[in-house]
C-alpha cells in the first residue's frame, strides 16, 4: 500500500557550518579545534568544503526548485565570537543575516543550530564543555543570537550531544582525541544538557518569538539474542550511554533511577566519577517541559552482545566494509545479525529502528511536543556519470525511512518533518570527501552542483506527499 505524509510536512535538507561553509579563516572567523586536528590527523581539511559561505544562493535556489522547503543551518560560533566570548565579529553577523534573508526569499525555512561540533578553539583547548565556565559562554552566545537574529523561527541549541562526547572521549576521532574515558563522556553530555536547558529557559523567559529544541542522535539498540538476559542488559547499557542519559535530561529534568544504576555500573567497571550538582538539576527541571520540538538524527541501529573483555573501538573511516570494531568493558560488543544490510562504513541499514525510536520517545517521554527527523540519509561512494549520480540505493534508503515515519504518524506520533542529510555533498568529519550524502552532487574541484537522481525523486515526494 502506498504511504503518504501530511500536507504541512517539512521536506528539508540538512547542512552544518563547518562541513559546508569552507572559508575557515575568512572575514574574521576565529579558529576551531578541528582546524589543526584535521591537519595533524587526517588526509583532508574543511577547506573549501562545499563553499557554502559563497555559494549559498545557488544551493537555496536549487532547494526551491527541488521542493526542499526547510534547511538545517548551523551558525559557526567562532564567526560571531572569534574566541567564543568577548568582542563580536560584525562580518560574521552580517553573513548570517544575508543567509537567512536568502532562505526566506527562496521560501526555505531555516532551522538554525547554535552548536554543531565546532566549539571555538580558545574554549575547546580550555576543556570544552568539561569546563563549566564554557556553559556560561555558550549561554551568552545563545542570548546574543536570539536577540540579533529575530528573523529565525526555529532554534536548536546543540546538534548531537551524544556523538560529541563519544567522538571526543570514547572513540577518540574528534578533538582532543581521547579514547575510552566513559566518565568524561557522561560529564560532557551532562554539562551540554545543562547548557541546553539554560538556553531554552532564557529563550522562553526572554519572550523571543519562534520555537526552540535540541537535536539528538538516537541509534536504536537491540539485544543480539533477545532471549539472553546478558544480551538484553548489554543493549540497555549501550542505550543509556547513547540515548537514555540525554533523553532523561531533556524530558525528565533528571536521570531516572534505572539510568543512574546503569551509569554507576559503567563507571564502577571503567573508573571515574561524575560532578552532578543540585543547581544542574534545577536548570534541567526548569526546561524539561519547555522544549518545542525534538530533532532525531537517525542513520542506523546496533545489536549488542554480552562481553567480558577489554574495551576496543576501531573506527571505519575509509569505507572499508567490515573493518570496524566496537566493544566496551562492562557494557557489551556490537554484533550485527547476518541478514541486516550495511553500508561500506559498517553502518547498519534498519528503518524499523527509526520507527521504534520515535515510538519509544512517545511512550517514555509523553511531555514531548513534536518531532522532526533532523538527519537521515545514506553515505555512498557516488559514481558521477552523465553529469548526475544514479543513486537508486539512496532513494530506496530514504523511501523506507519515510515509510516508517508515515507509520509512526498513523500510530499517533507527532512527526512534523524530515531533513535529508545532506542537502548537497559536504565534507564528513572523520571520513573526508569520499563519503557523499547529498541530493546535489558537488564537484569539489569546481564547486559546481549537479542534481542526483534522488533529488528528482525527492522533489516528487515533496510536491505530492506520496511516498513511491
From Swiss-Prot:
Keywords: Glycosidase, Hydrolase. It catalyses: a 6-phospho-beta-D-galactoside + H2O = D-galactose 6-phosphate + an alcohol. D-galactose 6-phosphate binds at residues 19, 116, 159-160, 297, 428-429, 435, 437. The active site is at 160 (proton donor), 375 (nucleophile). InterPro entries: 6P-beta-galactosidase, Glyco_hydro_1, Glyco_hydro_1_AS, Glyco_hydro_1_N_CS, Glycoside_hydrolase_SF. The keyword Lyase does not apply. It comes from the Bacteria. SUPFAM superfamilies: (Trans)glycosidases. GO terms for biological process: lactose catabolic process via tagatose-6-phosphate. Belongs to the glycosyl hydrolase 1 family. Its EC number is 3.2.1.85. This is 6-phospho-beta-galactosidase. The keyword Metal-binding does not apply. GO terms for molecular function: 6-phospho-beta-galactosidase activity; beta-glucosidase activity. It comes from Streptococcus pyogenes serotype M18 (strain MGAS8232). Pathway: Carbohydrate metabolism; lactose degradation; D-galactose 6-phosphate and beta-D-glucose from lactose 6-phosphate: step 1/1.
